């Protein structure tokens, strides 16, 4: 997990270098769930990331923060459907809406996908907390610039479920016919499950909260065997996601330095 000392460190470091780097603001909702294997793919492309942890007395990213993208993570037993709503739900929906209006790429994962859905005019339906191992099928050959696998596995640890607005495009469906990955606008993406999930993340979520999904022990054993497959499937997914969110393009930190020079 990222170990920056303050919420400003990654942004300060990225802008202080001779060749400024892109920085992603990551909203974390539980101690157990983080970017997981996605971290390695970002670091390998010289993309920094900074976690914001309102659940641990931290603050949400400010409106002025020069983030090149916003990632909203899952929330364990927290949801957005009215049963056990995330305490900072309203603020995060508004923050997401602001980032979308300014053109910043947004990626919502699990609960984060619900927040993104609400920010773009969709809704959320109540549903019990579940841990599901699913098979997803691509619905568009050009999804994620053609890098989304035709079929892939998805692990969903989530309460409630997003109900997409009509203008959203479903990029993949799970084997139950539900949206697994979807897109709204040019650069906002929702994932029902965390593509970078690790076995230890799910184990930590189970230990972190008193509420545990039904059949969690059985699903954990299945997930243990699935780890190498998930790791391989993440490679093309991250390639496409980084391209579609322009995270290899000129970072905001670089543009701000150019503006200061001018």
Provide a role label for each language-model segment.
Residues 33-37:
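Short N-terminal binding/cap micro-motifs at the start of the first secondary-structure element
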Residues 43-107:
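Flexible gly/pro-rich beta->alpha loop and the following alpha-helix that scaffold active-site loops
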Residues 27-29, 54, 111, 193:
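Cofactor-binding loop segments of dinucleotide-utilizing enzymes, especially the Rossmann-like FAD-
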Residues 20-25:
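Extreme N-terminal starter segment of soluble prokaryotic enzymes
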